[in-house]
Amino acid sequence: MSGHSKWHNIQGRKNAQDSKRGKIFQKLSRELYMAAKQGGPDPSGNPSLRLVMDKAKAANMPKDNIKRALDKASDRDAANYDEVTYEGYGPGGVAILVEALTDNRNRTSSTVRVAITRHGGNMAAAGAVSYMFDRKGYLVISRDDLDVDEDQMLEDALEAGAEDMQTSDEAFEIYTDPKEFAQVRDALEEKGYKFVQNELTMVPQNLTPIPEDKVEQFQAMIDQLEDDDDVQEVYTAGDWPDD
């Protein structure tokens, strides 16, 4: 993981994602619904729900939208969703994982396959790609107006139980064992740190540079996947070239 900046790659795609706010709220509503359905509507006793609520707040999701999703979870007749992961390779042979919440596996499998193959990629069998990624807790602290140097930040992160930290001019990226994520987050919050992003994510063990002549095609593939209502997350091992 050392030397891999997830934040750099997120920022490389940020402008494209900013135009999808309505779609993001729709996906978050489904995540909130599922988390509340499985673990109850109280985030203090449901770590999964607290995590999704943090994501919703970071995305500036309206409180009414959050409330509607939680209220829906108490409806016994509301739809249920299956969690499904698809694996494949995008343009340039870059590994990708697609996580979905679906009420129709056949529909979602078909639309994911079309999005990947249409843009020069191919689907892969279960297990062909997932071993290249590790589940990690991921916390990002912006360096804007933060009077803490890298050494102090690293000391605080490790003391809280973090595994690793990456530093850029813009942010500190902190990685944790997924089981220790809540502990690390809470310990750093107690020290006054605020997060611009905090989530459980899939981190590639190694990055594959996206060829410059494939960047547009790769982005188009991700856009089509993320436009699918069933797709919740798209993870890639792609290293985006600097602008």
Curated annotation (Swiss-Prot):
InterPro entries: Integrase-like_N, TACO1_YebC-like_2nd/3rd_dom, TACO1_YebC_N, Transcrip_reg_TACO1-like, Transcrip_reg_TACO1-like_dom3, YebC-like. SUPFAM superfamilies: YebC-like (SSF75625). One of its GO terms (molecular function) is DNA binding. This is Probable transcriptional regulatory protein LCABL_11860. The keyword DNA-binding applies. One of its GO terms (cellular component) is cytosol. Belongs to the TACO1 family. It holds the Pfam family TACO1_YebC_N. It is found in: Cytoplasm. It comes from Lacticaseibacillus casei (strain BL23) (Lactobacillus casei). Residues 1-23 are annotated as: Disordered. GO terms for biological process: regulation of DNA-templated transcription.
